């Protein structure tokens, strides 16, 4: 724990390389910034710089640091570093322009004691995912991949996301694969319609709750855009199959959502993606998305007529490791 290490126990050094925790500023977190105890670890960097007085430093953090708290968080950081006697520069850099087949935006903050360091004079070049992929590797034969290729060809799944959270032509949904039980065309069409309809802000106004991306709708509300006989039984069958859930709308309470039991329950998509063996089939003619540790094992590559995960070597290339 760096907070418990006195600077007298740290050897002298010339350059500090540091990355303070990104969760307080990350779009994947709650973006609490310095309110988060992890966000205060920047001040440990300041403490060490003040005591050891190295020639320079290079700090790294996520894109969210730029605009967090209206830019005030970054301003505090830069001001504190300048007050220590450093010439400070910073820039948001995207790895896709520096030879990596991955879009990964990061803020770099650099400082030295005698000059500003330019972060605008790098040679830029791009590569695509296909440039770093291996071929002919073993593919995965599992119930999931068998289901996938019983409904789609390998060529059809390239570039597709597999999740039930949103719609669109680039998504494949669990009901289109029959993962929880084979569905009829009518059931598929309805679920695709509900997936889009539940996002409309008018439902939040009608229910009397802050809008959320995916409102649970009652059978009566659903009947206003989808009419059929025995609608209630139709919906309940999809609940029994596991494609729909019956739940209360969720009200906003501070930085999270909790069920509002004063509102009637409605039907909602059972959303999620990490429950799927694969959640994204990468396109070799494009870039990989920003890699997240918990998601990377769910990324798929079409290879040799089947589907496999990224190899270790491919993962290393995506992160900029040299071939040796």
What is each of the regions a protein language model found here?
Residues 100-179, 185, 191-192:
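Flexible, glycine-/basic-rich loop-and-beta segments that form/coincide
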Residues 170-324:
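C-terminal target-recognition/interaction regions appended to catalytic cores
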Residues 2, 63, 85-97:
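Conserved S-adenosyl-L-methionine
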Residues 9-10, 101-103, 282-285:
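Extracellular/periplasmic catalytic domains that process cell-envelope and extracellular macromolecules
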Residues 1-55, 59, 63-75, 79-82:
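Core alpha/beta nucleotide-donor-binding catalytic domains of modification enzymes
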Residues 77-92, 113-115:
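A SAM-dependent methyltransferase catalytic signature shared across enzymes that methylate proteins
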Residues 23-27, 65-68, 99-102, 116-119, ...:
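Short catalytic/ligand-binding loop motif for oxyanion handling, primarily in non-cytosolic enzymes
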């Amino acid at each position: 724990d760096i907070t418990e290490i006195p600077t007298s126990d740290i050897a002298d050094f010339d350059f500090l390389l540091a990355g303070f925790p990104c969760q307080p500023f990350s779009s994947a977190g709650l973006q609490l910034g310095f309110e988060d105890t992890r966000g205060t670890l920047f001040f440990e960097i300041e403490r060490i710089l003040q005591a050891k007085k190295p020639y320079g430093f290079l700090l790294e953090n996520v894109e969210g640091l730029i605009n967090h708290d209206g830019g005030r968080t970054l301003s505090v950081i830069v001001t504190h570093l300048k007050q220590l006697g450093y010439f400070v520069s910073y820039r948001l850099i995207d790895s896709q322009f520096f030879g990596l087949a991955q879009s990964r935006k990061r803020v770099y903050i650099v400082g030295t004691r005698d000059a500003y360091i330019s972060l605008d004079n790098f040679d830029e070049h791009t590569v695509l995912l296909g440039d770093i992929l291996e071929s002919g590797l073993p593919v995965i034969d599992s119930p999931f991949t068998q289901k996938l290729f019983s409904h789609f060809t390998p060529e059809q799944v390239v570039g597709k996301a597999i999740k039930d959270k949103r719609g669109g032509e680039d998504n494949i949904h669990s009901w289109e694969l029959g993962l929880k039980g084979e569905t009829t065309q009518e059931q598929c069409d309805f679920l695709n319609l509900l997936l889009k309809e539940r996002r409309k802000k008018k439902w939040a106004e009608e229910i009397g709750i802050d809008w959320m991306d995916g409102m649970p709708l009652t059978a009566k509300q659903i009947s206003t855009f989808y009419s059929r006989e025995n609608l209630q039984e139709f919906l309940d069958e999809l609940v029994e199959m596991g494609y729909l859930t019956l739940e209360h709308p969720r009200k906003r309470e501070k930085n999270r959502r909790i069920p509002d039991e004063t509102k009637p329950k409605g039907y909602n998509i059972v959303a999620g993606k990490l429950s799927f063996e694969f959640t994204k089939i990468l396109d070799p003619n494009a870039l990989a998305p920003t890699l997240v540790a918990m998601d990377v094992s769910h990324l798929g590559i079409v290879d040799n007529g089947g589907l496999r995960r990224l190899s270790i070597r491919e993962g290393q290339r995506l992160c900029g490791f040299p071939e040796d």
